[in-house]
Amino acid sequence: MIKNRIKEYRAIFDMKQEELARLVGGRRETIGNLEKGRYNPSLALAWRIAQVFKVPIEDVFTVED
């Protein structure tokens, strides 16, 4: 299972789901589903999200057994 800290980083950056979605070329619903663990991102999307927050991808996403 892939866990993420998207919501935490959005709070740090005072960013709404809509804004993050726009910056990564996605939809608000996708960001919401990622945050709730309902959807695993593609590598490209995960990389773009990490770029927005200016952190390594592994700071945002972790894999748990």
Regions found by a protein language model. Give the residues of each.
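DNA major-groove recognition helix of helix-turn-helix/homeodomain DNA-binding modules
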Residues: 44-59
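Short basic helix-loop element that most often maps to the first helix and adjoining turn
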Residues: 4-23
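Residues in the helix-turn-helix
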Residues: 19, 30, 59
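Short, conserved catalytic or interaction motifs in soluble domains
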Residues: 36, 55, 65
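Recognition helix of helix-turn-helix/homeodomain-like DNA-binding domains
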Residues: 25-39
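Helix-turn-helix DNA-binding elements, focusing on the entry/boundary residues of the two helices
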Residues: 17, 28, 46
